[in-house]
């Protein structure tokens, strides 16, 4: 499929051919769901922890005699039924990551790109660059394009001035091609690719 290439000043500067096998696949919500869950699970820190009975600070003395008191027998004041005691079956430090086949991850990225095309939310620009690292200047240019929630994906390296200028603009993210992922594509309303990004993504996903 063909689409227009524009500049950041909203001027049409040419056309580009988008590969149908990458930007025109059927949109499957189940694949996107699996990919987003995989990403979010993988980045969880998993450092939640409660103390077991062996880790609780306190006496190890038996609180009272086993027999003769008429009360239920107790062996430790660090047990879970006492104030300040341990937690039974509480969370432990662990990784939440789970496997997702490479083919599914690849299909999910194609699906996310195709979903943006299907929604009319994909824009191709000639370059994502800025003459100076001034946020005000870039914000004005994005305002002309009507971009309020946007992910920019550039080539192998992101323009330094553009990255600095966009850093303080809310809901504007910038990634190099190798950082392109399903979650970041879906969490922003509009996806903007540079021509270099299109070429790199097609090479990566073919």
Curated annotation (Swiss-Prot):
Keywords, comma-separated and alphabetical: Ribonucleoprotein, Ribosomal protein, RNA-binding, rRNA-binding
InterPro entries: Ribosomal_uL4, Ribosomal_uL4-like, Ribosomal_uL4_dom_sf
Top-level division of the source organism's lineage: Bacteria
GO biological process, one term: translation
One Pfam family named in its UniProt record: Ribosomal_L4
Residue numbers spanned by region Disordered: 49-73
One GO CC term, this protein: ribonucleoprotein complex
Gene Ontology molecular function: rRNA binding; structural constituent of ribosome
NCBIfam families linked to this entry: rplD_bact
Reported function: One of the primary rRNA binding proteins, this protein initially binds near the 5'-end of the 23S rRNA. It is important during the early stages of 50S assembly. It makes multiple contacts with different domains of the 23S rRNA in the assembled 50S subunit and ribosome. Forms part of the polypeptide exit tunnel.
Family: Belongs to the universal ribosomal protein uL4 family.
Quaternary structure and interacting proteins, as annotated: Part of the 50S ribosomal subunit.
Protein name listed in UniProt: Large ribosomal subunit protein uL4
Organism placement in taxonomy: Bacteria, Pseudomonadati, Pseudomonadota, Alphaproteobacteria, Rhodospirillales
């Amino acid at each position: 499929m063909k689409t227009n290439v524009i500049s950041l000043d909203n001027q049409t500067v040419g056309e580009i051919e988008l590969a149908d096998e990458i930007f025109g696949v059927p949109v499957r919500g189940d694949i996107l769901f699996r990919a987003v869950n995989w990403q979010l699970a993988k980045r969880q820190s998993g450092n939640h922890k409660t103390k077991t009975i062996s880790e609780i600070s306190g006496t190890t003395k038996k609180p009272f005699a086993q027999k003769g008191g008429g009360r239920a027998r107790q062996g430790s004041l660090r047990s879970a039924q006492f104030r300040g005691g341990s937690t039974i079956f509480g969370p432990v430090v662990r990784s939440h990551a789970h496997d997702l086949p490479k083919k599914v991850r690849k299909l999910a990225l194609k699906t996310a790109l195709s979903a943006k095309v299907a929604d009319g939310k994909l824009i191709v620009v000639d370059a994502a660059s800025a003459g100076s690292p001034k946020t005000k200047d870039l914000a004005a240019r994005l305002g002309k394009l009507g971009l309020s929630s946007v992910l920019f994906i550039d080539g192998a390296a992101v323009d330094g001035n553009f990255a600095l200028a966009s850093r303080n603009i809310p809901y504007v993210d910038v990634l190099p091609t190798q950082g392109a992922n399903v979650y970041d594509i879906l969490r922003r309303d509009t996806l903007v690719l540079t021509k270099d990004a299109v070429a790199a993504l097609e090479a990566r996903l073919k």
